[in-house]
A protein has these predicted regions:
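...with weaker cross-activation on analogous glycine-rich loops/strands in unrelated enzymes
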Residues: 1-45, 53
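Glycine- and charge-enriched low-complexity intrinsically disordered segments
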Residues: 56-67
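A solvent-exposed, acidic/Ser-Thr-rich amphipathic alpha-helical stretch
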Residues: 50
Length: 67
């Protein structure tokens, strides 16, 4: 509930993007630009991924802008 809700087509660098990756699992990343976001994988460490990748597109939940 902290920050402002942001529509996916209005994302800016630094916005937090949230994903539902399972029934009780959540994942968060930080938007960079041009569909890319930075996040940490327990198996691969720090990664850059794209919101348009099929996995992330289907798991996308919401975004927040913290000021």
């Amino acid at each position: 509930k902290i920050g402002l809700a942001v529509k996916q087509d209005q994302l800016r660098a630094g916005d937090l993007v949230f994903f539902k990756t399972g029934i009780f699992s959540r994942h968060v990343g930080m938007y960079i630009d041009k569909g890319e976001f930075l996040h940490v994988s327990s198996s691969n460490g720090v990664m850059v991924s794209n919101l348009e990748d099929s996995y992330w597109r289907s798991a996308y939940w919401k975004a927040r802008r913290v000021q």
